[in-house]
Design a protein with these regions (language model features):
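Conserved catalytic cores of very large enzyme subunits
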Residues: 1-170
């Protein structure tokens, strides 16, 4: 099913069938999952947080399947972000952080967002949103979370290389 999802979101249907929809997927360490889903229940009444290990394992499988698909096909989406809580000079969920960093070292396919509080989220655009004040939430998952490139500085290495005529100057 993960493969179907990846292929489906990469199908061109926006702008005259030439572009696929922009899609973000966030992956969370234990403290983020606890903050986001701590009091939430499944339809059968069980608490989501009781399945935190299974949720983390599913996220890892999702990331590995996505990376495997991308190793064989050029897939633009989803844009992936891993959110990790970093306090007092260390990751609070060290096992998950080690996995996330090792995964990204191998595949280089994710943005890694480290923060000292689980009250903020980030997605592909590196824009930090406060989850304590979502503003609104609707039945299809829409919220007032910010997306965009506010206060984002991007170093355009390709442009720097273009403007320098030899490797020494670059």
């Amino acid at each position: 099913q993960i493969q179907r999802f990846i292929y489906a979101i990469n199908q061109p249907y926006v702008r005259d069938g030439m572009q696929s929809a922009f899609t973000n997927v966030s992956v969370f360490d234990g403290p983020y999952l606890e903050a986001l889903f701590g009091g939430s229940t499944f339809p059968d009444g069980t608490f989501m947080i009781d399945y935190i290990d299974e949720i983390k394992e599913f996220q890892k499988i999702f990331m590995e399947v996505t990376a495997d698909i991308r190793s064989k096909n050029m897939m633009t989406f989803p844009v992936l972000t891993m959110s990790l809580l970093y306090q007092n000079g260390k990751f609070t969920d060290e096992e998950f952080a080690r996995w996330a960093i090792e995964h990204n070292r191998k595949w280089n396919d994710s943005n890694i967002f480290c923060d000292s509080s689980v009250n903020s989220l980030s997605n592909c655009c590196r824009l930090k949103s406060n989850i304590e004040d979502l503003g609104y939430f609707n039945s299809i998952g829409g919220t007032a979370l910010k997306v965009g490139s506010v206060k984002v500085s991007t170093i355009n290495l390709a442009r720097i290389a273009l403007e320098h005529y030899n490797e020494k100057d670059y």
